[in-house]
């Protein structure tokens, strides 16, 4: 039974378990006791205000590097760039050296940053908040006296935003770090690497970092005689334009191309001006949206603002031209007389240039009125009741075969030759001039003459109205092509500017 699986646990009595626990905690206690002694020894007479140099004339060499964690936001309106950075600072403090063998082999020690001397490195072009970083993080001490402090900080730095090519713009935002109170004789900065550390960078959804080189400068300011060193990072960023392309540029392009269709819309539908004004109102709404996303500056006009302004002028001109076209379209002979040059240019020349064909008129194929001949004039007389009573037989004349009609036909035959060479109205006048015609026939012929002249006047007026409508159609077609070319060339010219500027740079 003692050889069973429960024999080992049963052999460990409570005193033995307590002894094993104490033995396992002994190294930890030794390490904690060693670190405690080390901490007490290091900071027994340590003053965090005094520079850690053996000779007062020696500068403290600060190795400095900035790591970008996140590009939080770029505020174009207030011209502020918000970033999340890690500021790596390394220097040597001769007061914080120890022999690891005297303290249980401890080579490193982490202490609160408030306990040690730190360089007062600030962001010179800070726009909002504290200029210095928070010192609540701990610093790493090495037995050689090397101190490494990497505090995180969120900075809101001033950045001059150039919105000339918005939303296809590139920005150059600088971040200038340096000691605020120590000059180069007290603190000297050394740049770690040649650019900002982007290994832990979290990609932004709106901006892409092209490069971030760093430079060291020694500057003498007007306030002081000493030289102050600083390390400046130039952050070159490019805006990702996908959001603005989908939500702003493409709708504006589609709306602007609707302006071209105004000139293809027939004038008789009565919706040309309505379409123009609708496009103008839509662009106005887009302009109001854009003004909230660009800086409130009068130095430059952003690219999207130029395009909207171009399109609004474009639409306004289309409204003016449409009103003029409608004025031409509804002109009549009673209000306007078409000049000869208008007929030549807009009815003959420009339609051929614009490849416009007008349906041919059927007036040439229509049967012209035939003048009345002598026999027909005599028959008109014989058909009258008054003259039919004059027939010798006393019966109505049929087909003009009675003797009396035959006598009248010979009498008026002398007028036939002249009447055949006259117009229809002249023939009617000739008929009316014959005293032999009865009053009923004269009245009927006068009525026919009135109707014919009225119809002829209406046809002539309709032809003139059709000419004015065709002139308006030609003007519409001209501006259709003109506005199409201007819209395409203007759009391409505006949005190719960032590409050309990038190549020049």
From Swiss-Prot:
Ubiquitinated; by STUB1/CHIP and thereafter degraded by the 26S proteosome complex. The modification Phosphoserine is found at residues 413, 416. InterPro entries: Neur_chan_lig-bd (IPR006202), Neur_chan_lig-bd_sf (IPR036734), Neur_channel (IPR006201), Neuro-gated_channel_TM_sf (IPR036719), Neuro_actylchol_rec (IPR038050), Neurotrans-gated_channel_TM (IPR006029), Neurotransmitter_ion_chnl_CS (IPR018000), Nicotinic_acetylcholine_rcpt (IPR002394). GO terms for molecular function: acetylcholine binding; acetylcholine receptor activity; acetylcholine-gated monoatomic cation-selective channel activity; ligand-gated monoatomic ion channel activity. It comes from Homo sapiens. Activated by a myriad of ligands such as acetylcholine, cytisine, nicotine, choline and epibatidine. The heteropentamer CHRNA3:CHRNB2 activity is blocked by alpha-conotoxins ImI, ImII, PnIA, GID and MII. The heteropentamer CHRNA3:CHRNB4 activity is blocked by the alpha-conotoxin ImI and AuIB. Its main location: membrane. Residues 267-268, 327-474 are cytoplasmic. It is a multi-pass membrane protein. Neuronal AChR is composed of two different types of subunits: alpha and beta. CHRNA3/Alpha-3 subunit can be combined to CHRNA5/alpha-5, CHRNB2/beta-2 CHRNB3/beta-3 or CHRNB4/beta-4 to give rise to functional receptors. Forms stoichiometries such as (CHRNA3)2:(CHRNB4)3 or (CHRNA3:CHRNB4)2:CHRNB3. Part of a complex composed of STUB1/CHIP, VCP/p97, CHRNA3, and UBXN2A that modulates the ubiquitination and endoplasmic reticulum-associated degradation (ERAD) of CHRNA3. The chain crosses the membrane at residues 251-266, 269-285, 308-326, 475-493. This is Neuronal acetylcholine receptor subunit alpha-3. Residues 1-31 form the signal peptide. It holds the Pfam family Neur_chan_LBD. Glycans are attached at residues 55, 172. It comes from the Eukaryota.
